[in-house]
Amino acid sequence: MATRQPYQKKFQSRDQREQTSSQQAPNSVVKQVTVDALVVMKIIKHARENPHEPVRGPLLGLSQLADASKPGEDALLEVTNCFPTPRVSDDDDDSIVQQYQVQMMRWLREVNVDHMNVGWYQAADMGTFFDEDVAAVQFQHQRHMAESVVLIYDPVLTLQGTLSLSAFRLSNKAMELFSTDSFNPKAVREAGLTYRTVFEKVPVTIRASSMARLLIPELSANLDQSEIFDRMDLNATSFMSRNIKLLMEGIDDLSQEAYKFQQYHRNATKAKASLDAQLEARRAENEQLRAKGLPEKSEAELVANHKTPTPPSRLGSLLVTAQINTFCKQVSDFSGQSFGKLYIAKATQPEAEE
């Protein structure tokens, strides 16, 4: 069995990380995430036991920190273990989950298992994970550890024949806006944040042990070859209709976000017009006071007492737009695969006799 000694020098444990936190680069960028096959199997098992539920759990592993003396160096992340988070009702206290996670990591540490929290995972059907809750949880993880990522597992897309496991992290621009809690239109525009740059996708590499790689050819030889043809199924009505339905719901949500912004714009225009009218009346009143030799009234008082409408947060619209973009990509990719199946099916059919 391969020893983990080489990784002890390359990666740092939590205790070592606390000792070198002062030397860490302020904005460590993760360019590669390595996930053990055991972690993938645990995530899949958790999702299968709770179908159509956004199950979650913490990721444990090791981190290679970026050297502060080398600004161009990137951080590397290795996910070696995970465990599911228990389901709680809305009436339960959130501290129950936190206490459970802390206790689990303490037990793992006692048995010499990697116990450093390097992120979290979530199961999301059809890629429905771009929401404010996911962004807020990821912000809390990256605030405590800049290299943290969220692994998104899609069980529906996986059933189509390809494992759907992606890693995401909040961009530096999004982290800055989250830290100041300012997602108003002006702040978003000045930061240059778009729906494409809220989350950054990080490449994922799945690592299997040497014994598992040796076992794969043996399992492949015993595989029922008839199951391979299930991928050629042309009946894609259920998948496509569900994707289109989610796409329409996303467009409705985006329309609501646009209506909120338009309502704010109208209220802001009315408020500005009201302030301009009050200032104009105050100037006319001051002219009369000057003519009588009386002291003028301050215009700054009107400006200070004037209430302007609060601009709406643009985070919701950015995430909804990113979600719509994901649905469009899924429809495009699946349509391309379906056309390929149709051409293959046509080529295998005997030509009709004239």
From Swiss-Prot:
Assembly and interaction partners: Component of the eukaryotic translation initiation factor 3 (eIF-3) complex.
Domain MPN positions: 33-174
Name of the molecule in the record: Eukaryotic translation initiation factor 3 subunit H
Principal location: cytoplasm
Annotated stretches, region: Disordered: 1-28
Biased composition annotated in UniProt, kind: Polar residues: 19-28
Function: Component of the eukaryotic translation initiation factor 3 (eIF-3) complex, which is involved in protein synthesis of a specialized repertoire of mRNAs and, together with other initiation factors, stimulates binding of mRNA and methionyl-tRNAi to the 40S ribosome. The eIF-3 complex specifically targets and initiates translation of a subset of mRNAs involved in cell proliferation.
Record organism: Monosiga brevicollis (Choanoflagellate)
Cellular location(s): Cytoplasm
PROSITE patterns, alphabetized: MPN (PS50249)
GO BP annotation list: formation of cytoplasmic translation initiation complex; translational initiation
Record-level GO cellular component terms: eukaryotic 43S preinitiation complex; eukaryotic 48S preinitiation complex; eukaryotic translation initiation factor 3 complex
Source taxon at top rank: Eukaryota
GO molecular function, one term: metallopeptidase activity
Record key words, sorted: Cytoplasm, Initiation factor, Protein biosynthesis
Pfam family, one: eIF3h_C
Protein family membership: Belongs to the eIF-3 subunit H family.
